[in-house]
């Protein structure tokens, strides 16, 4: 699991924890746990055509492509290159609650924490 840019907050706001995963079992467990825990998550796509954005002119790989487009997707694609032999999840966490809400005080917050722990519990005990 990785967290990185926070770039997805522009698309989904502070209430949803955006994530990427290529593991169908984890996705199923996470979506179920998120609903049960009232800890919402939103799956974003690995859009493979954006691989070209992280191909640099000089180095082997570019973790911060110019232009500012698709920052959360390019970050997920970048990290995926390092875990090609393993199931993978990347959460693009914002981690800040701008206003108080039930079970979410204003300020720093562990986005998707309850959902992830419940999903892992389900995966590890089944």
Language-model-derived ranges and their functions:
Residues 1-126:
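A generic structural signal for tightly packed, nonpolar segments enriched in small/aliphatic residues
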